[in-house]
Swiss-Prot record:
Residues 494-504 have a biased composition (Basic residues). GO terms for cellular component: plasma membrane. GO terms for biological process: carbohydrate transport; lipid transport; positive regulation of platelet aggregation; sphingolipid biosynthetic process; sphingosine-1-phosphate receptor signaling pathway; transmembrane transport. This is Sphingosine-1-phosphate transporter MFSD2B. Residues 1-33, 483-504 are annotated as: Disordered. It is found in: Cell membrane. Coiled coil: none annotated. It comes from Homo sapiens (Human). InterPro entries: MFS_2, MFS_trans_sf. Keywords: Cell membrane, Lipid transport, Membrane, Transmembrane, Transmembrane helix, Transport. It catalyses: sphing-4-enine 1-phosphate(in) = sphing-4-enine 1-phosphate(out); sphinganine 1-phosphate(in) = sphinganine 1-phosphate(out); sphinga-4E,14Z-dienine-1-phosphate(in) = sphinga-4E,14Z-dienine-1-phosphate(out). The chain crosses the membrane at residues 113-133, 150-170, 185-205, 233-253, 287-307, 320-340, 350-370, 373-393, 412-432, 459-479. CDD domains: MFS_MFSD2B (cd17452). It is a multi-pass membrane protein.
């Protein structure tokens, strides 16, 4: 991250590259830096709105893509496993590639990161639409959905890496960055709630129980053309949000210039920067812990709808349960931001544990009242699991910058490699879990699944997320976590960044 120099009168001498001595002048400069680093309410909201389309699309795919591929496209579970695994791996592989090219890109009139966000938008929208399109042929549907899911995940990565790294270039103030992150998470979740509501209401007619009651055949149910059209309409609604939200992002957010860009001296290569970041102990602990936690959340989301449809009598409550998860996540995000500021980030991590007993309860007692309680608690836990890593990453970057003489640009490597590892873990978790459905005898399009499939879904909704969350929290709790830099440390960090080398 690059921090702008503190305001000074014309002709004043430039600061020397050493820590300023404490005193009245230092305190005054600290207050001026704090005021200069403040972000307006409009900027924070517009920054959050920019991430809404990707979150809407990700939420729709998380809750409904697996069900769509199995029951509407009627692809065998083994092929669905390959589609999900290939798409996630494609998105994961795109992260270091995105970090490499973004760090080598030159600053333009709109910044260094913003052009990547703008350039990816139309292609993401097209890939997302065709992901939900049912082609007329049947033999190559697996290849069709693998292609477009891989394209969507890769393009979404090239959008998300610069968008999330933009947090470090909004302001030099750590507290304001945390606030911008909270605004982003809240606005994104509100958009996700709206998108999931619209998507779910549109496609609900494709999964009604009368679809099975109307036929006496034990084999797969014929897919109605109306069901495929409903998914296309839902996809088109999501596609429209991309140009609208990105326009607001460009109008309301200004990327700060990088004052160390013209600094002399050799640059740091991408591979050298990646080697440095992946050997930083606080970063390693953060990444490994959230490998398990994020994979648990993805498994819970992916199998909730399938569990309600095939392993319990909750198919009439699917929309209500999804909305409960998202509403509780949206409402609890501001509360978790207050907890982060008041009690610290490590303490807030215990909120993720709340999902564990309730996930087991849902698998054991799959009734409607229990399901709604579990959905509410899961939403609260998901909120903190999403907010916490993005709030801790800037502190990890600052901790790294205080220990190493390397300038701005490395923040993109931190963000891209974090997303790479979490996506890779999600790919493995979803791929293996979906393959387990194939081994248990899941039949695409069949109304009543075998008892082995029901047991497998209960394990996937209860035991698997529980083990992953416990493992992730144990790793996160070991050792100390980076603290928010003090005022003097922030001043030293700002001086070091202004006198250090930039990333080549």
């Amino acid at each position: 991250m690059a921090a702008p120099p503190a305001p000074a009168a014309k002709g004043s001498p430039q600061p020397e590259p050493h820590a300023p001595e404490p005193g009245p002048g230092s305190a005054k400069r600290g207050r001026e830096d704090s005021r200069a680093g403040r972000l307006s309410f409009c900027t924070k909201v517009c920054y959050g709105i920019g991430g809404v389309p990707n979150q809407i699309a990700s939420s729709a795919t998380a809750f409904y893509l697996q069900l769509f591929l199995l029951d509407i496209a009627q692809i065998p579970a083994a092929q669905v496993s390959l589609v999900l695994f290939g798409g996630k791996v494609s998105g994961a592989a795109a992260d270091p590639v995105a970090g490499f090219f973004i760090n080598r890109s030159q600053r333009t009139g709109s910044g260094r990161l913003m052009p990547w966000v703008l350039g990816c938008t139309p292609f993401i929208a097209l890939a997302y639409f065709f992901l939900w399109f049912l082609p007329p042929f049947t033999s190559l549907r697996g290849l069709w959905y693998t292609t477009f899911y891989c394209l969507f995940q890769a393009l979404a990565t090239f959008f998300q890496v610069p968008y999330t790294a933009l947090t470090m270039l909004l302001t030099p103030c750590p507290r304001e960055r945390d606030s911008a992150t909270a605004y982003r998470m809240t606005v994104e979740m509100a958009g996700t709630l709206m998108g999931a509501t619209v998507h779910g209401l549109i496609v609900s007619g494709a999964h009604r129980p009368h679809r099975c009651e109307a036929t006496a055949t034990p084999g797969p149910v014929t897919v109605s053309p109306n069901a495929a059209h409903l998914y296309c309409i839902a996809a088109a609604v999501v596609v429209v949000t991309y140009p609208v939200c990105i326009s607001l992002l460009c109008l309301g957010v200004k990327e700060r210039p990088d004052p160390s860009a013209p600094a002399s001296g050799p640059g740091l290569s991408f591979l050298a920067g990646l080697s440095l970041t992946t050997r930083h102990p606080p970063y390693l602990k953060l990444v490994i812990s959230f490998l398990f936690i994020s994979a648990a959340v993805q498994v819970e989301q992916s199998y909730l709808v399938l569990f309600c449809t095939h392993a319990s009598q909750l198919h009439d409550h699917v929309q209500g349960l999804v909305l409960t998860v998202l509403v509780s996540a949206v409402l609890s995000t501001p509360l978790w931001e207050w907890v982060l500021q008041r009690f610290g980030k490590k303490t807030s991590a215990f909120g993720i544990f709340a999902m564990v007993p309730f996930a087991i309860l849902l698998a054991a007692v799959p009734t409607a009242p229990v399901a709604y309680v579990v959905a509410f608690v899961s939403g609260v836990s998901i909120a903190v699991s999403l907010l916490l890593p993005w709030s801790m990453l800037p502190d990890v970057v600052d901790d790294f910058q205080l220990q190493h003489r390397h300038g701005p640009g490395l923040e993109t490597i931190f963000y891209s490699s974090y997303v790479f590892f979490t996506k890779l873990s999600g790919a493995c978790a979803l791929g293996i879990s979906t393959l387990s459905l194939e081994f248990s005898g899941y039949k695409a399009g069949v109304c009543k699944q075998a008892e082995e499939v029901v047991v497998t879904l209960k394990v996937l909704i209860g035991a698997v997320p529980t083990c992953m969350i416990l493992a992730g929290l144990c790793i996160l709790m070991v050792g100390s976590t980076p603290k928010t830099p003090s005022r003097d440390a922030s001043s030293r960090l700002s001086l070091r960044r202004r006198t250090s080398y930039s990333l080549a």
